[in-house]
Amino acid sequence: MKNNCETGQQSLAINSNKKVAIKDGGIIFSTLMLLPAILHFLVLYCGVNLNSILLAFSVPKSDGGQEFSLYNFQRFFANMANPESQVYMALFNTLEYYLLKVCKYALTSIVSYFFYKKLPGHIAYKILFFLPSMIPDMVYISIFKQFISKYGPLYEFLGLFGYKMPSLLLEPSTAEGVIMFYHFWSGFGPQLLIQVGAMNRIPSDVIDAAKIDGCVGFKEFWFIILPLVFETIATYFLLGIVEIFQSTGPFLFFVGSDMPEVYTLQYWIFQQTLGGASNYPAAIGLVFTMLALPLVLISRYFINKVETVTY
């Protein structure tokens, strides 16, 4: 009896040691796997952004050094009070692109449902929406510019009705609208693929049961489809909030860098940094980072409040 107890205690001790060894080995393995990502975060994110924060609170001195100052922030708030400043216009354009992105998310869900139900004409619409995604941007934009150019196909067509179309890309007021239209139309491809894929995963039994209860058409879309693919839509929405101040469009392909009225905040900061002015852009980046952070956290909080549907 005594030998059996000793044997049992030894077995327990061996099993306990094995569990500790496995646990320690798992921790070491996990640490080694995460080490490259941690180093990448520390060097390329924390290191770079720490330098940006220091630049935001400093101004260049005559001897080439830097001195502490709040001038960059004072300049920013002064520019934001002036609608004619480049920063103000760049921010306004950026928010326009973001609102366009939100509208595109909503329309993508409707178009995805159209494809999911395989309604008449869905193949033609697939070609129409996916074509810009399959052809390189530079090629497709060149074709699009020729189509809307003076004496181009659109110009000649409108001329049949007595309307002489102006050069749309020469004036900021019309150039921005053309660029946003192209950006809106050409960005459906990837989102459509993901949302249609999410809808195709819905069990047919769920759809059949909804039809028996009289849930068809818009009711099916609103009460059945949307709740079941909400996680996919919410992920896109949250990513959009993260990039709210980074929204931009392909305006460089259309008008180059000679039209500041169509700049977005992201490109304006890049252009300023390229010209050697790092302090003021760093301050602007810091301000909008501090604005975006609570927006992301609040949005995530309310998204998590929505009850997810599993199937």
Question: For the regions a protein language model found, what residue spans apply to each?
Answer:
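Short, Lys/Arg-rich, polar N-terminal cytosolic tail immediately upstream
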Residues: 1-24
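A structural signal for multi-pass alpha-helical bundles of membrane permease subunits
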Residues: 22-311
